[in-house]
Regions:
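Bacterial N-terminal signal peptides that target proteins for export
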Residues: 2-11
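C-terminal motif of bacterial Sec signal peptides marking the signal peptidase cleavage site
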Residues: 20-22
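Solvent-exposed, well-ordered loop and adjacent helix/strand elements within mature globular domains
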Residues: 24-368
């Protein structure tokens, strides 16, 4: 799937969510649906009361049933601005709906008035036929590091070598040491690993600004999901698996971390792009909670979506609420299939925490 840097970054980002958090045993990426199927989906925001089974993937509706306010109008307009600046193709192809939705937003974004602006809505079938679309999350991590090895900062982040066919274990054993490939040294082997799984992220050198580390390549070895390994080993119950659970296990078992990670021979290399921005497969910088990764066979890149986002607390429990967000489909991933969206949560630990807990359900309306 090495189409370009962005797409591979997305591929690995989504693997973080699906393969770490849901512990899927399938080869590359599978729907995180399997992670929530062992329990009642209603505990994760799925709703059935008052709904009829829907056969069509997308069904036109006269009105959006959720009457709550859209809460991210400003972020959505910022996302559209990024599209206009970075993608003439999407701007041109979707100009009519972008213009209509912009006018609707500026007029107050009342869902009862969509038809007044010539906006037509189609509701997605959902994984179950009752409009319950699976929603996971991804984010951009921030790694604390130094430019040279010093004290606790002794875990290297490598640039792409000319000879990259070394396994993770060989790299940990020093196969790349002294070749001038060290971009940074962090203080955490598990943080470096998760940066590799995300495929890109930010590095804080303690100099007052963040440096973007973009995906540069991979060593050619297959990816093994460490979350699945921890479940199989009996270390973490499947229903408790999340990125945070992996971090907690690593903090409690520092002497075992390297052995676990070496069971995943895949290794990702980076390049320093100080002025870089987090972009999706469409090549457009992403605005948190105004952009999603989708299955482009169902939802083409550039599509405008009204998303009923399930609200969760800091432990990942659904609060009983959904809130409406306007979003644009700007990313893809092999793990995002059918009625499954991956919501971009933003930068840093809190964004990562919520992303790692997200495996909930809500409705999605495609606006045309």
């Amino acid at each position: 799937m090495r189409l370009n840097q962005t797409l591979w970054s997305t591929f690995l980002t989504l693997s973080a969510i699906v393969l770490l958090a849901s512990c899927s045993s399938n080869g590359s990426k599978t729907s995180r649906n399997s992670g929530a199927s062992d329990v009642d989906p209603q505990k994760f925001g799925a709703v059935y009361q008052g709904r009829s089974y829907q056969q069509a993937i997308l069904a036109p509706v006269n009105q959006v049933e959720n009457k709550s306010a859209v809460i991210n109008q400003g972020d959505f307009l910022a996302q559209l601005s990024n599209i206009h600046s970075y993608s003439g193709k999407l701007s041109s192809n979707f100009a009519p709906i972008y213009d209509k939705v912009t006018a609707w937003v500026l007029a107050g974004a009342n869902v009862n008035e969509l038809n007044n602006f010539g906006i037509h809505s189609q509701v997605m079938k959902g994984f179950d036929g009752y409009q319950n679309v699976l929603m996971t999350g991804y984010y951009s991590p921030v790694i604390h590091a130094r430019r040279t090895q010093q004290g606790k900062y002794n875990q290297p982040i490598y640039a792409l070598p000319s000879q990259k066919r070394f396994s993770r274990a060989e790299i940990y054993a020093g196969a790349l040491k002294g070749k001038g490939l060290e971009l940074a040294y962090s203080d955490s082997m598990i943080d470096n690993f998760l940066l590799g799984v995300q495929g890109s992220g930010y590095v804080d050198f303690g100099e007052g600004n963040l440096n973007y580390f973009a995906y540069a390549g991979q060593n050619g070895y297959p990816y093994a999901a460490v979350g699945r390994l921890l479940v199989e080993d009996g270390e973490i119950p499947k229903e408790k698996m999340s990125i945070q659970a992996i971090r907690d296990w690593a903090n409690a078992n520092p002497s075992r971390v390297q052995g676990l990670l070496e069971r995943n021979p895949s290794y990702v290399f980076f390049k320093n792009d100080p002025n870089g921005k987090v972009k999706g497969a469409a090549g457009v910088p992403l605005v948190p909670m105004a952009s999603v990764a989708s299955d482009r066979g169902v939802i083409p890149l550039g599509s405008v979506l009204l998303v009923e986002v399930p609200q969760i607390d800091n432990e990942g429990n659904w609060t009983g609420e959904h809130k409406l967000h306007l979003m644009v489909a700007l990313d893809v991933g092999g793990a995002v299939n059918g009625h499954h969206f991956d919501l971009y949560r933003g930068i840093g630990d809190q964004a990562g925490h919520i992303a790692g807990l997200s495996k909930h359900y809500g409705r999605v309306w495609v606006l045309r």
